[in-house]
Regions:
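N-terminal capping segments
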Residues: 27-109, 219-236
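Bacterial N-terminal signal peptides that target proteins for export
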Residues: 2-13
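Cell-wall glycan-active module
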Residues: 3, 26-27
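Aromatic- and glycine-rich peptidoglycan recognition patches
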Residues: 27-34, 151-236
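Bacterial N-terminal signal peptides
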Residues: 13-22
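...with weaker cross-activation on analogous glycine-rich loops/strands in unrelated enzymes
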Residues: 54-55, 104-186
Length: 236
């Protein structure tokens, strides 16, 4: 099977499971059923060795990136008089709401479900899921395995984190904005060097998105490039 066919099959399969409602996002606490806990979902990040280069954004995409940056350093997410949950999915939902885009459109309000998965589903239906090599300002960036949601000690937790792309640096490092426990900050990801945190001259290629914990299983990764799942570009 070709790489493109494999990616397509994986995306369709993942979307089917998302619509079945078995995944959880970065800020939820509802546990999966015992049956779904036993399911082994392929969650190894896609390595984009030719990624990434910056594509010129249309005005709405540029506005999304600028809005995301304005939230850096803040702990509250309020847009148009409405407050959003101070987690990763709430953050990106608020950013997109600034351009009158509801990332939960047609999916109902989140009630103990999966925020990141719902946004992924929206992007599949109303945009494009891809792996580069070009990235637009305001694109969404999805990650797997940023925490052990199902508690089984294995790196089999899909779509656990999300951020908004700000820009791509000349060396291919993607700068994105996201909300973690320490607030809304900028982070870096370099898919050409996914296993490198910092170079010998001090440049950061990949920030840590997962905390190291006692008992982490074999194959557990921690850097943004290692945990990368996909990009999402909304249709114009």
């Amino acid at each position: 099977m070709s790489r493109a066919s494999s990616r397509s099959s994986w995306t369709i399969g993942l979307l089917t499971l998302l619509l079945a409602g078995i995944f959880s996002g970065c800020a939820t606490s509802t546990r999966q059923s015992a049956a779904s806990d036993r399911m082994m979902i392929p969650t190894t990040g896609t390595r984009g060795m030719s990624c990434c280069a910056m594509a010129k954004g249309v005005p709405r995409q540029t506005a999304l990136a600028k809005t995301a940056v304005r939230f850096v350093g803040q702990s509250r997410i309020q847009v148009g008089g409405r407050s959003y949950n101070p987690d990763c999915s709430g953050f990106v939902r608020g950013v997109y709401a600034s351009q009158r885009v509801d990332l939960y459109s047609g999916l109902g309000e989140l009630d103990g479900g999966n925020g990141v998965g719902r946004i992924y589903t929206h992007m599949v239906e109303h945009g494009r899921i891809h792996y580069g090599p070009t990235v637009h300002p305001g694109d969404l960036v999805f990650f797997h395995n940023t925490w052990d949601f199902n508690g089984d000690g294995l790196p089999n937790d899909p779509l656990t984190h999300i951020g908004v792309v700000e820009k791509v640096e000349p060396d291919g490092t993607v700068l994105f904005v996201s909300s973690l426990s320490r607030g809304i900050e900028r982070y870096r990801m370099n898919l050409q060097h996914p296993d490198i945190h910092k170079t010998t001259d001090g440049r950061v290629f990949n920030d840590f998105l997962r905390r190291k914990r006692f008992g982490d299983g074999v194959g557990t990764h921690y850097l943004a490039g290692q945990l990368f799942a996909a990009f999402g570009t909304l249709s114009h």
